[in-house]
Amino acid sequence: FIEQEHFSQLMNILRRLDGGQRLTDDDVLWLRTEGKDYFSETFQEAFHAREAAFFAGEYRRTSDPWNAVNASSHYRKCRQAQEAHDLLTSIPAQRQNASKLRSAIATTHGGVMRDLGHLESALNFGTQAHALTPKDFRPCTLLGAVNFELGNYDIGQDWYAKAAERGASERSIDQDLRSILLHADQVKWEEIKAFLLRDDPVRYSWVSNLHPHKSTSKGKSRDKPN
Protein backbone atom coordinates (compact mmCIF):
# COMPACT_ATOMS: atom_id res chain seq x y z
CA PHE A 1 0.00 0.00 0.00
CA ILE A 2 1.34 3.43 -0.97
CA GLU A 3 0.39 6.48 1.05
CA GLN A 4 -1.22 9.17 -1.11
CA GLU A 5 1.39 11.78 -0.19
CA HIS A 6 4.19 9.41 -1.27
CA PHE A 7 2.66 8.17 -4.51
CA SER A 8 3.97 10.81 -6.91
CA GLN A 9 7.55 10.76 -5.60
CA LEU A 10 7.74 6.97 -5.50
CA MET A 11 6.36 6.58 -9.03
CA ASN A 12 8.84 9.17 -10.30
CA ILE A 13 11.73 7.25 -8.74
CA LEU A 14 10.50 3.93 -10.11
CA ARG A 15 10.06 5.31 -13.62
CA ARG A 16 13.58 6.69 -13.68
CA LEU A 17 15.09 3.50 -12.29
CA ASP A 18 13.12 1.40 -14.78
CA GLY A 19 14.36 3.69 -17.55
CA GLY A 20 17.97 2.97 -16.67
CA GLN A 21 18.65 6.24 -14.89
CA ARG A 22 20.61 6.56 -11.66
CA LEU A 23 18.83 7.79 -8.57
CA THR A 24 19.93 11.05 -6.99
CA ASP A 25 21.34 11.32 -3.47
CA ASP A 26 18.04 12.90 -2.42
CA ASP A 27 16.13 9.93 -3.87
CA VAL A 28 18.24 7.46 -1.92
CA LEU A 29 17.96 9.49 1.28
CA TRP A 30 14.16 9.58 0.93
CA LEU A 31 14.01 5.82 0.32
CA ARG A 32 16.09 5.16 3.42
CA THR A 33 14.06 7.47 5.64
CA GLU A 34 10.54 8.61 4.82
CA GLY A 35 10.06 6.04 2.05
CA LYS A 36 11.79 3.12 3.76
CA ASP A 37 8.62 1.00 3.75
CA TYR A 38 8.79 0.95 -0.06
CA PHE A 39 12.52 0.22 -0.32
CA SER A 40 12.03 -3.54 -0.56
CA GLU A 41 14.80 -6.09 -1.09
CA THR A 42 13.91 -6.34 -4.79
CA PHE A 43 13.91 -2.54 -5.10
CA GLN A 44 17.28 -2.30 -3.35
CA GLU A 45 18.78 -4.92 -5.64
CA ALA A 46 17.57 -3.01 -8.70
CA PHE A 47 19.14 0.16 -7.31
CA HIS A 48 22.47 -1.54 -6.62
CA ALA A 49 22.45 -3.24 -10.05
CA ARG A 50 22.05 0.19 -11.70
CA GLU A 51 24.86 1.65 -9.60
CA ALA A 52 27.11 -1.33 -10.32
CA ALA A 53 26.53 -0.93 -14.05
CA PHE A 54 27.34 2.78 -13.83
CA PHE A 55 30.61 2.36 -11.93
CA ALA A 56 31.66 -0.60 -14.09
CA GLY A 57 31.10 1.61 -17.12
CA GLU A 58 33.13 4.38 -15.50
CA TYR A 59 35.94 1.91 -14.86
CA ARG A 60 35.96 0.86 -18.51
CA ARG A 61 35.96 4.53 -19.53
CA THR A 62 38.59 5.86 -17.12
CA SER A 63 40.56 2.78 -15.98
CA ASP A 64 40.35 4.23 -12.45
CA PRO A 65 40.49 1.25 -10.05
CA TRP A 66 38.33 3.06 -7.49
CA ASN A 67 35.43 2.77 -9.93
CA ALA A 68 35.97 -0.99 -10.01
CA VAL A 69 35.94 -1.07 -6.20
CA ASN A 70 32.69 0.93 -6.10
CA ALA A 71 31.10 -1.24 -8.79
CA SER A 72 32.09 -4.40 -6.93
CA SER A 73 30.58 -3.15 -3.68
CA HIS A 74 27.27 -2.62 -5.49
CA TYR A 75 27.51 -5.97 -7.31
CA ARG A 76 27.74 -7.66 -3.91
CA LYS A 77 24.50 -6.00 -2.85
CA CYS A 78 22.54 -7.29 -5.84
CA ARG A 79 23.70 -10.93 -5.66
CA GLN A 80 26.29 -10.61 -8.41
CA ALA A 81 29.44 -11.53 -6.49
CA GLN A 82 30.91 -13.35 -9.49
CA GLU A 83 30.68 -10.15 -11.54
CA ALA A 84 32.54 -8.36 -8.77
CA HIS A 85 35.23 -11.05 -8.68
CA ASP A 86 35.74 -10.86 -12.44
CA LEU A 87 35.98 -7.07 -12.31
CA LEU A 88 38.44 -6.95 -9.42
CA THR A 89 40.72 -9.56 -10.96
CA SER A 90 40.83 -7.50 -14.16
CA ILE A 91 42.56 -4.53 -12.47
CA PRO A 92 46.17 -4.43 -13.73
CA ALA A 93 48.80 -4.76 -11.00
CA GLN A 94 50.58 -1.62 -12.17
CA ARG A 95 47.47 0.44 -11.39
CA GLN A 96 47.36 -0.83 -7.81
CA ASN A 97 50.05 1.48 -6.48
CA ALA A 98 48.82 3.26 -3.33
CA SER A 99 48.46 1.26 -0.11
CA LYS A 100 44.96 2.64 0.54
CA LEU A 101 43.78 1.52 -2.90
CA ARG A 102 45.37 -1.92 -2.61
CA SER A 103 43.77 -2.35 0.80
CA ALA A 104 40.35 -1.32 -0.54
CA ILE A 105 40.69 -3.80 -3.41
CA ALA A 106 41.78 -6.59 -1.05
CA THR A 107 39.01 -5.84 1.47
CA THR A 108 36.33 -5.73 -1.23
CA HIS A 109 37.69 -8.87 -2.90
CA GLY A 110 37.72 -10.59 0.48
CA GLY A 111 34.04 -9.74 0.90
CA VAL A 112 33.35 -11.12 -2.57
CA MET A 113 35.14 -14.37 -1.73
CA ARG A 114 33.10 -14.55 1.45
CA ASP A 115 29.90 -14.19 -0.57
CA LEU A 116 31.03 -16.98 -2.89
CA GLY A 117 31.82 -19.26 0.04
CA HIS A 118 35.61 -19.22 -0.40
CA LEU A 119 36.36 -18.38 3.22
CA GLU A 120 40.08 -19.20 3.27
CA SER A 121 40.60 -16.93 0.29
CA ALA A 122 38.55 -14.24 2.03
CA LEU A 123 40.78 -14.63 5.08
CA ASN A 124 43.90 -14.17 2.96
CA PHE A 125 42.53 -11.01 1.35
CA GLY A 126 41.57 -9.60 4.74
CA THR A 127 45.03 -10.30 6.13
CA GLN A 128 46.62 -8.55 3.14
CA ALA A 129 44.34 -5.54 3.59
CA HIS A 130 45.07 -5.25 7.31
CA ALA A 131 48.82 -5.36 6.66
CA LEU A 132 48.45 -2.53 4.14
CA THR A 133 46.25 -0.28 6.31
CA PRO A 134 46.56 -1.45 9.93
CA LYS A 135 44.59 1.55 11.26
CA ASP A 136 41.54 0.93 9.04
CA PHE A 137 38.64 -0.89 10.69
CA ARG A 138 37.28 -2.37 7.46
CA PRO A 139 39.78 -5.24 7.10
CA CYS A 140 39.21 -5.98 10.79
CA THR A 141 35.45 -6.36 10.37
CA LEU A 142 36.03 -8.61 7.35
CA LEU A 143 38.40 -10.80 9.37
CA GLY A 144 35.94 -10.84 12.25
CA ALA A 145 33.11 -11.99 10.00
CA VAL A 146 35.13 -14.64 8.17
CA ASN A 147 36.50 -16.11 11.40
CA PHE A 148 32.99 -16.36 12.82
CA GLU A 149 31.87 -18.19 9.68
CA LEU A 150 34.86 -20.53 9.99
CA GLY A 151 33.91 -21.29 13.59
CA ASN A 152 36.85 -19.36 15.09
CA TYR A 153 34.64 -17.36 17.42
CA ASP A 154 37.27 -16.12 19.87
CA ILE A 155 39.51 -14.97 17.01
CA GLY A 156 36.55 -13.37 15.27
CA GLN A 157 35.59 -11.50 18.42
CA ASP A 158 39.16 -10.25 18.80
CA TRP A 159 39.04 -8.86 15.26
CA TYR A 160 35.72 -7.15 15.96
CA ALA A 161 37.28 -5.60 19.07
CA LYS A 162 40.11 -4.28 16.90
CA ALA A 163 37.55 -2.92 14.45
CA ALA A 164 35.79 -1.08 17.28
CA GLU A 165 39.11 0.38 18.45
CA ARG A 166 39.64 1.70 14.91
CA GLY A 167 36.25 3.34 14.57
CA ALA A 168 33.67 0.68 13.68
CA SER A 169 30.38 1.30 15.47
CA GLU A 170 28.84 -1.25 17.82
CA ARG A 171 25.70 -1.07 15.68
CA SER A 172 27.55 -2.01 12.48
CA ILE A 173 29.34 -4.89 14.20
CA ASP A 174 26.07 -6.21 15.61
CA GLN A 175 24.51 -5.94 12.14
CA ASP A 176 27.39 -8.05 10.85
CA LEU A 177 26.81 -10.68 13.52
CA ARG A 178 23.06 -10.65 12.89
CA SER A 179 23.67 -11.29 9.19
CA ILE A 180 26.07 -14.14 9.98
CA LEU A 181 23.47 -15.73 12.24
CA LEU A 182 20.73 -15.42 9.63
CA HIS A 183 22.92 -17.19 7.06
CA ALA A 184 24.08 -19.93 9.45
CA ASP A 185 22.85 -23.51 9.55
CA GLN A 186 21.15 -24.78 12.70
CA VAL A 187 24.32 -26.13 14.33
CA LYS A 188 26.37 -23.00 13.73
CA TRP A 189 23.41 -20.85 14.76
CA GLU A 190 23.32 -22.52 18.17
CA GLU A 191 27.11 -22.27 18.57
CA ILE A 192 27.24 -18.57 17.73
CA LYS A 193 24.20 -17.77 19.86
CA ALA A 194 25.72 -19.56 22.87
CA PHE A 195 29.09 -17.87 22.34
CA LEU A 196 27.66 -14.36 22.12
CA LEU A 197 25.35 -14.75 25.11
CA ARG A 198 28.21 -16.18 27.15
CA ASP A 199 30.51 -13.35 26.07
CA ASP A 200 28.14 -10.46 26.88
CA PRO A 201 24.51 -11.38 27.66
CA VAL A 202 23.43 -7.73 27.93
CA ARG A 203 24.89 -6.44 24.68
CA TYR A 204 23.85 -9.53 22.73
CA SER A 205 20.40 -9.94 24.26
CA TRP A 206 18.97 -9.30 20.77
CA VAL A 207 20.25 -12.74 19.72
CA SER A 208 17.45 -14.41 21.67
CA ASN A 209 14.86 -12.65 19.50
CA LEU A 210 16.25 -13.99 16.21
CA HIS A 211 15.11 -17.20 14.57
CA PRO A 212 17.16 -19.46 12.27
CA HIS A 213 16.86 -18.76 8.55
CA LYS A 214 17.20 -22.01 6.60
CA SER A 215 17.92 -20.70 3.12
CA THR A 216 21.27 -19.35 1.97
CA SER A 217 22.40 -18.20 -1.46
CA LYS A 218 25.94 -18.35 -2.81
CA GLY A 219 26.79 -15.03 -4.38
CA LYS A 220 24.26 -13.21 -2.24
CA SER A 221 25.61 -10.28 -0.33
CA ARG A 222 25.48 -10.01 3.41
CA ASP A 223 23.78 -7.00 4.93
CA LYS A 224 27.14 -5.23 5.40
CA PRO A 225 29.71 -5.19 2.68
CA ASN A 226 32.78 -6.57 4.41
Language-model segments: residues:
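Flexible helix-coil transition and linker loops at the boundaries of alpha-helical arrays
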Residues: 51-62, 91-100
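Hydrophobic/aromatic packing residues within the alpha-helices of TPR/SEL1-like helical repeat arrays
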Residues: 48, 55-56, 88, 126, ...
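Boundary/linker segments of alpha-helical solenoid repeat arrays
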Residues: 96-102, 135-140, 165-178, 203-209
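Alpha-helical positions within canonical tetratricopeptide repeat
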Residues: 50, 83, 121, 155, ...
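Alpha-helical adaptor scaffolds
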Residues: 68-133, 138, 142, 149
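TPR/TPR-like (Sel1-like) alpha-helical repeat modules
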Residues: 148, 153-171, 178-185, 192-203
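Amphipathic alpha-helical repeat scaffolds of TPR domains
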Residues: 4-39, 60-77, 100-111, 174-176
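Alpha-helical junction/boundary sensor with strong preference for TPR arrays
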Residues: 62, 88, 94-96, 133, ...
